[in-house]
Regions:
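Acidic, Ser/Thr/Pro
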Residues: 2-165
Length: 165
């Protein structure tokens, strides 16, 4: 190769390497921010929950981690419940029920809708306040959308992800 062709070859290879490195770094930054949200007051985000009825045992979960004390309203379901918890928030009936399972059977206990708790009922969903990390069971037979809305007067920072298993 002549000197000029060699110089152009090295320049082209250098630009290719620089472009690849920049693309990889951009993808890394994009992946790091996946599922992280900051909502201003009144803003909302929609998360799609897909049904996997063709699977024998399918399961959908909403993983929510709040990083501040702002209030978020979760809507789009008739009822809400956390994994590992016996408390069910029924939006349709506007009731909170604790299910107590013992060797004698199952007992249901109605709980008051206390707005000082970390989770309470609203007319069309539940409100989550304070720093919290919870996993909500969101399995349904048909696909639907969960809406997360900032109902506070300050910005809300959180991570939310729907996992379909």
């Amino acid at each position: 190769m002549t000197y000029r062709k060699n110089k152009i070859w090295k320049l082209g290879c250098g630009l290719l390497i620089l472009t690849l490195a920049t693309s990889i770094f951009g993808l890394y930054l994009w992946a790091q921010n996946l599922g992280k949200y900051t909502l201003q007051p009144g803003q909302s985000v929609e998360l799609k929950v897909f049904s996997k009825t063709e699977q024998l045992e399918y399961n959908s979960e909403l993983i929510l981690e709040k990083k501040d004390d702002a209030k978020l309203k979760l809507s789009g379901r008739k009822g809400w419940g956390m994994k590992g918890s016996n408390t069910v928030y029924n939006v349709e009936k506007q009731s909170i029920t604790e299910i107590i399972i013992s060797k004698d059977g199952t007992e249901r206990k109605d709980l008051p809708n206390d707005k000082s708790k970390s989770i309470y009922l609203e007319s069309d969903g539940i409100v989550v306040q304070g720093e919290i990390k919870d996993v909500f069971g969101v399995t349904e037979e048909t696909s639907y959308t969960i809406t997360i809305t900032n109902v506070d007067d300050k910005p809300a920072h959180f991570e939310a992800q729907v996992v379909d298993r």
